[in-house]
Design a protein with these regions (language model features):
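Non-catalytic signal-transmission and effector/linker regions of two-component phosphorelay proteins
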Residues: 1-16, 22, 26-29, 46, ...
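Two-component signal transduction core modules
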Residues: 62, 126-127
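Alpha-helical interaction/dimerization surfaces of two-component signaling modules
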Residues: 30-35, 51, 119
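Short amphipathic alpha-helix used as the core "switch/output" element in two-component signaling
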Residues: 50, 72-100
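Acidic di-acidic motifs
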Residues: 19-20, 65
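Acidic, metal-coordinating helix/loop segments flanking the phosphotransfer/catalytic sites
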Residues: 41-61, 65, 69-72
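Hydrophobic/aromatic residues positioned on beta-strands within the core alpha/beta folds
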Residues: 106-107
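Conserved phosphotransfer active-site motifs of two-component signaling proteins
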Residues: 67, 82, 110-113
Length: 168
């Protein structure tokens, strides 16, 4: 066995980190960059959807918070292709765009508070906040080394109505 072989798969991977909490986003971004990953960051779903739609290179992993702020009302005179939605909808839209096939969903909500999102959280890798840097890195490496997810499973799909046009 070569003692100089990397312990994990190639770190030449791109990760998109989405979290509205600046301190949590900073911890994730700094940790992942220090490990050699290329890291894109977004403070919310609108920004993350724009990155997913416009970034030219593959995004190997989407690390997103479950509870991203959404507006109470999202109506204006022009359609917004990058609406503010929760993290589970960001995942569903990322898969629909075929921009990533690996995700980690994170949240500070307890298991009981997440019950309404169980269809999603039971089908994707989940990171409970607060978490250690070691736990983050271990899960990131496990997910990148695993088979890509498929969102053909209707239980894991977003509860968002695809016929609803988002404005705002």
């Amino acid at each position: 066995m070569d003692n100089h072989a990397p312990m994990y798969p190639s770190l030449a991977k791109t990760i998109l980190v989405v979290d509205d909490d600046p301190s949590m986003r900073l911890i994730c971004v700094k940790t992942l960059r220090a490990a050699g990953f290329t890291v894109l960051e977004a403070e919310g779903s609108s920004e993350s959807l724009k990155i997913l739609a416009t970034h030219q290179e593959p995004i190997d992993l989407l690390l997103t918070d479950l509870m991203l702020p959404t507006p109470d009302l999202q109506l204006t005179s022009t359609e917004n292709p990058y609406p503010r939605v929760h993290g589970h909808d960001v995942i569903q839209r990322a898969f629909a765009m075929k921009k990533t096939s690996r995700v980690i969903l994170m949240s500070g909500l307890s298991y009981h508070e997440r019950k309404g999102y169980q269809a999603v959280t039971d089908h994707v890798p989940f990171l409970q906040k607060p978490f250690s840097v070691e736990t983050l890195m271990q899960l990131v490496h496990e997910v990148l080394a695993s088979a890509p997810l498929s969102f053909d499973d209707s239980a894991a799909k977003s509860t968002a109505n695809p016929d609803v046009r988002w404005y705002g």
